[in-house]
Regions:
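Conserved AMP-binding A3 loop
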Residues: 102-129
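Conserved AMP-binding/adenylate-forming
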Residues: 1-35, 148, 353
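Gly/Ser/Thr-rich phosphate-binding loop
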Residues: 191-195, 206-266
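AMP-binding/adenylate-forming catalytic domain of the ANL superfamily
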Residues: 407-430, 452-454
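Conserved ATP/PPi-binding loop(s) of AMP-dependent carboxylate-activating enzymes
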Residues: 272-276, 287-317, 352-354
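Conserved pre-ATP/AMP-binding loop-to-beta segment of ANL
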Residues: 83-106, 113, 136-142
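Conserved AMP-binding/adenylation subdomain of ANL enzymes
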Residues: 125-142, 152-191
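AMP-binding/adenylate-forming catalytic core of the ANL superfamily
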Residues: 193, 301, 328-411, 437
Length: 455
């Protein structure tokens, strides 16, 4: 078994090459084509990949020295438009439940350096089977892939599901205007689409501008980051006849952990554990908490990853035999999981825990605020809570006054900064590091600023 890198935009050529790597008994190191090529080179070297299949158009743009230790092989994307997966792709796909390495997926790096996550064929195939169990696709269904295939949720929850069930699949480029996606959903009679909250918000906004006819669309699945109540409510109002289900997971566990289903989970939870997965919530001492109490989410599954290329899990398990997800959450009285924040994002102010997502939820109740992100930032030796928000107007004082009636004093951000757009990672997640950098820069440029309130 060798590790073989693969770099390319979504295309039939990409999928065909991926299956060829697997059929040759090798492990595919999936690298996002949008990251700098120098970073991809570092990842290849880290993963000991000696061969790299790369889309010809991307290879033509390489402007750094290429090491002799890696053999680059180009392939043609062939088509820049969305297209249906042809029969020969389904025919050459072979189900594989061995424990040999299947893929190396690099984490999104929302809080730091990306880590190479090793997943076996057994892990991704058993997880895909569990997804099929709740998704229940039929021969009449058609799934639309709008996110990059180098991410575990797209690879396992969309591509593998389609290949295993022979469901029709439309593969589309990733960086396109929302009207392109909506037009293709109509053109190809798409029934299932999987989005992240950012894409869902973009499609909702575009749909409001022009009333598209989407009679075939029967299900929208949302994953990738916490779905705010504001986006959730707007999407349900925009697509009243299309069920919208939250799903949750992380690459280290296959990736899917929980999912909403038609027979349950009506609110903005992330659903219940899927087949073969167990979830428990524990406190910092490793003791299980009661329903409704916040704790650290731990998962037990047969789809567990094989480890990292370099390093160890950042969050040590607090419950023997379970994987620490690094997420704070709780289970409600209906047995549904709710994700609150990453453990790393929780802010400690005067021994009090502040959950950014809860502060953000209150800020987003202000209609003129389109998006916001709350994070901890250091200034003159002190730790403060700061907020970046997107709005047409400067609403600093308005937001602050509104929060006084809804939050405790120490939960209210000390500094508010209006911006045109929130900083995001390559896959659309809000970058905590980017938010902190923007806030820190603002404070440095306004060193004598009077920061109102006390936290």
């Amino acid at each position: 078994m060798s590790r073989v890198a693969l770099i390319g935009e979504n295309s039939i050529g990409y999928i065909s090459t991926l299956i060829d790597i697997w059929n040759n008994g090798d492990c595919a190191v999936l690298l996002d084509w949008r990251i700098p090529f120098a970073t991809s080179l570092d990842m290849m070297i880290e993963a000991s990949a000696q061969t790299c299949f790369i889309e010809q158009s991307l290879f033509d743009k390489v402007d750094v020295e290429i090491p002799n230790s890696i053999n680059f092989i180009t392939y043609d994307k062939q088509n820049n438009a969305a297209e249906q997966l042809p029969k020969f792709i389904y025919d050459k796909f072979k189900e594989n439940y061995s424990h040999a390495e299947a893929v190396v997926i690099y984490s999104s790096g929302t809080t730091g350096k990306s880590k190479g996550i090793i997943l076996s064929h057994f892990a991704i195939n058993t997880n895909a089977d569990a997804i099929i169990d709740y998704m229940r696709p039929t021969a009449e269904d058609c799934i639309y892939i709008a996110k990059t295939l180098s991410h575990s949720s797209t690879l396992t929850g969309e591509l593998l599901v389609a290949l295993k069930t022979k469901m029709s699949l439309v593969i589309a480029p990733t960086i396109v205007p929302p009207r392109y996606t909506l037009n293709n959903i109509a053109k190809y009679n798409v029934t299932i689409v999987c989005l992240n909250p950012t894409l869902l918000s973009m499609l909702s906004n575009q749909y409001e501008r022009k009333n598209y006819e989407l009679p075939s669309l029967k299900t929208i699945y949302v994953s990738g980051s916490i779905l705010s109540d504001k986006i959730y409510d707007k999407a349900h109002a925009t697509f009243p006849n299309t069920p919208i289900y939250n799903v949750y997971g992380l690459s280290e566990v296959g990736p899917r952990v929980t999912a909403q289903r038609a027979e349950c989970c009506k609110g903005n939870s992330v659903g219940k554990p899927i087949k073969g997965v167990e979830v428990t919530i524990v406190n910092e001492q490793g003791n299980c908490v009661v329903d409704g109490e916040y704790g650290i989410v731990h998962v037990k599954t047969h789809s567990m990853f094989n480890g990292y290329i370099i390093g160890h899990p950042k969050h040590v398990s607090l419950c023997e035999g379970w994987h620490n997800t690094g997420d704070v959450g709780y289970i409600d009285i209906n047995g549904e999981l709710h994700i609150i924040n990453r453990v790393d994002d929780v802010i400690i102010i005067d021994s009090h825990k502040v959950y950014p997502s809860e502060v953000e939820r209150r800020i987003l109740e202000q209609n003129d605020v389109k998006e916001c992100a709350v994070a901890k930032v250091e200034h003159n030796g002190n730790e403060l809570i700061g907020c970046l928000y997107v709005s047409r107007e400067d609403l600093n004082n308005v937001i602050r006054e509104k929060l006084k009636a809804k939050l405790l004093t120490y939960e209210i951000p000390r500094v508010f900064v209006k911006c045109d757009a929130l900083p995001r990672t390559k896959n659309g997640k809000v970058s905590t590091y980017g938010v902190q950098t923007r806030l820190r820069k603002h404070l440095e440029q306004n060193n004598n600023i009077h920061i109102k309130g006390r936290s």
